[in-house]
């Protein structure tokens, strides 16, 4: 909320919008496509069990072997429909602002290698947008929070200008959060 107030003070006009779907709706479509394409790209390495490869990466990539052509094509059609809908919705706006993640950063010791915390950022990839994740404060636990600025395809300059303005207007004490490593 503080970041939004700062952007408003800099002249940004903020509008709450209702999205045509939830960010959670993207999960299954992305999972099918990313798994299938990831496996197709790396199968020569993934299938050779004697090669040294992180077990979590291997397990995630192997999931793509079981994605059917039907599921893959259905997910691609779904993603294309979302792209059209969002491009129409975004015509009136320079950017979409969301948190970068559901939570503050977590200590490295608590990272679950099988969980990809990409609830909001996953949409950026599906919708072929550009985005900038910008640290914007600290949660009650003292760990960093982040704002994600999503922009139109190839509108990196706009997204970077918004991020630069926000960063320059928020002088935050620079500190390294405790307990991350």
Segments predicted by a language model, with ranges:
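Structural helix-boundary/capping segments
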Residues: 1-10, 67, 73-77, 84, ...
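General small-molecule cofactor/ligand-binding pocket signal
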Residues: 13-18
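Short, surface-exposed loop/helix-turn segments at secondary-structure junctions
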Residues: 28-33, 73-74, 103-122
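Short helix-loop capping/hinge segments that flank enzyme active sites or metal/cofactor-binding pockets
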Residues: 32-87, 133-144
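Small-aliphatic-rich amphipathic alpha-helix that forms the alpha element of a beta-alpha
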Residues: 87, 111-135
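Glycine-rich, N-terminal phosphate-binding loop of Rossmann-like dinucleotide-binding domains
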Residues: 100
């Amino acid at each position: 909320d503080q970041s939004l107030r700062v952007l408003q003070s800099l002249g940004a006009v903020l509008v709450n919008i209702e999205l045509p779907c939830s960010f959670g709706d993207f999960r299954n479509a992305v999972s099918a496509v990313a798994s299938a394409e990831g496996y197709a790209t790396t199968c020569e390495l993934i299938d050779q069990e004697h090669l040294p490869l992180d077990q979590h990466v291997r397990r995630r990539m192997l999931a793509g072997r079981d994605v059917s052509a039907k599921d893959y094509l259905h997910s691609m059609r779904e993603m294309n429909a979302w792209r059209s809908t969002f491009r129409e919705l975004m015509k009136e706006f320079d950017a979409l602002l969301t948190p970068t993640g559901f939570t503050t950063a977590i200590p490295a010791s608590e990272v679950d290698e099988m969980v990809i915390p990409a609830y909001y950022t996953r949409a950026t990839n599906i919708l072929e947008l550009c985005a900038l994740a910008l640290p914007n404060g600290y949660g009650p636990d003292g760990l960093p929070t982040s704002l994600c600025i999503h922009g139109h395809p190839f509108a990196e300059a706009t997204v970077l200008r918004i991020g630069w303005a926000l960063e320059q207007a928020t002088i935050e004490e620079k500190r390294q959060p405790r307990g991350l490593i």
